[in-house]
Swiss-Prot record:
Positions on the Extracellular side per record topology: 24-336
PANTHER family on file: CYTOKINE RECEPTOR, INTERLEUKIN 13 RECEPTOR SUBUNIT ALPHA 2
Location, primary (coarse class): membrane
Identification of the protein by name: Interleukin-13 receptor subunit alpha-2
Organism lineage string: Eukaryota, Metazoa, Chordata, Craniata, Vertebrata
Top-level taxonomic group: Eukaryota
Subcellular location per the Swiss-Prot or TrEMBL entry: Cell membrane
A Pfam entry, by short name: IL6Ra-bind
InterPro entries given in the database record: FN3_dom (IPR003961), FN3_sf (IPR036116), Ig-like_fold (IPR013783), Short_hematopoietin_rcpt_2_CS (IPR003532), TypeI_recpt_CBD (IPR015321)
Positions of transmembrane segments: 337-357
Ranges per topology, Cytoplasmic: 358-385
Native source species: Rattus norvegicus (Rat)
Signal sequence annotation: 1-23
Keyword Glycosyltransferase found: no
Length: 385
């Protein structure tokens, strides 16, 4: 029994040494010359590397690379598995960028086991020129009705009076970054930009940089990256109509706003007001049917607004509210009486007025009496003679 136990321990030790030795032999190096490059496209960066130095017995193996990257203040990494030697993506250049990469050996080269190299890392950041107080404030961009983009900002808190700002933009399809050609101004200072005719710019990262100039100090640049379809503010719905069916059902209709947005891309929010009560509803259609809360209500109105739905964008901006549309009510006996009474009063007044006019046109009774008296006197005198 003792001999069997010794043999078992020896066998286990031999297998462990064999496995360990085999694992130690399968190594792969990390990629070489990993770096993050800025081609001047306002945040669209290149992460590139060169293949690792590969041992002779792995030269026929296909290598894969596991790439992780993020802005330095982010809690999560974005992970990509690729066989290419370059990867491109957009970043927020207001913050630093960091990335790391390692090599993967395919399983058929390692007898089914996973083998990765150590990580190699790289980072990138824009040198901060100018104090934080010189950077623009409250930058906002809205893509109105999917037709034109308006960005606005306020000057930095500590800038001098000679400071002015310029805006550049880029998206995939442009050869290089372009400067705004239509600035919004206040006291001859640029406080915004309007961009039209942004062909083929939807569903792509849209990059913006606003920098400034002053003779007295450097101005810190500000960066933004977004996708246009996520900041669309449509026009409000038009041609509202409301009716009541069967004294209970409220039927509301409206037309989609004019412009290039497909009707299937809208979602709507409706506010119904019945006397002193109001409530909200939502729909993706341009009509809705609801039940009345009070059958005797005299005041029944609604208004509606819209934005891009989740099928066409990840986010959106609500339009302004439409004009309020109210129900005109029944045209039954009660409403007829309300209409007929003032009409009758009007005609009575008109008839009285005509009678007064006709009465003024008749001969005066005094004149007629005077003529008759003269005739009587004349007849009486003839008899005496």
């Amino acid at each position: 029994m003792a001999l069997m136990a010794v043999n078992t321990r020896c066998l286990c030790l031999f297998l462990l040494c064999t496995i360990t030795g085999h694992s130690l032999e399968i190594k792969v190096n990390p990629p070489q010359d990993f770096e993050i490059l800025d081609p001047g496209l306002l945040g669209y960066l290149y992460l590139q590397w060169k293949p690792p130095v590969v041992m002779d017995n792995f030269k026929e193996c296909k290598l894969e690379y596991e790439l992780k990257y993020r802005n330095v203040d982010s809690d999560s990494w974005k992970t990509i598995i690729t066989r290419n030697l370059i990867y491109k993506d957009g970043f927020d250049l207001n913050k630093g960028i960091e990335g790391k990469i390692r090599t993967h050996l395919s399983e058929h080269c390692t007898n089914g086991s996973e083998v990765q190299s150590p990580w190699t890392e790289a980072s990138y950041g824009i040198a901060d020129e100018g104090s934080l107080g010189t950077k623009i404030q409250d930058m906002k961009c809205i893509y109105y009705n999917w037709q034109y983009l308006v960005c606005s900002w306020k000057p930095g808190k500590t800038v001098h009076s000679d400071t002015n700002y310029t805006m550049f933009f880029w998206y995939e399809g442009l050869d290089h970054a372009l400067q705004c050609a239509d600035y919004l101004q206040d006291n001859e200072k640029n406080v915004g930009c309007k961009l039209s005719n942004l062909d083929s710019s939807d569903y792509k990262d849209f990059f913006i940089r606003v920098n400034g100039s002053s003779k007295l100090e450097p101005i810190r640049s500000s960066y933004m990256v977004f996708q246009l379809q996520n900041i669309v503010k449509p026009l409000p719905p038009e041609f509202l109509h409301i009716s009541v069916e069967n004294s209970i059902d409220i039927r509301m209709k409206w037309s989609t706003p004019g412009g290039p947005i497909p009707p299937s891309c809208y979602t709507y929010e409706i506010v119904v007001r019945e006397d002193d009560i109001s409530w909200e509803s939502a729909t993706d259609k341009n009509d809705m049917k609801l039940k009345r809360r009070a059958n005797e209500s005299e005041d029944l109105c609604f208004f509606v607004r819209c934005k891009i739905n989740i099928y066409c964008a990840d986010d959106g901006i609500w339009s302004e509210w439409s004009e309020e549309e109210c129900w005109e009510g029944y045209t039954g006996p009660d409403s007829k009486i309300v209409f007929i009474v003032p009409v009758c009063l009007f005609f009575i007044f008109l008839l009285l007025l005509l009678c007064l006019i006709v009465e003024k046109e008749d001969p005066e009774p005094t004149l007629s009496l005077h003529v008759d008296l003269n005739k009587e006197m004349y007849a009486y005198e003839e008899t005496l003679c």
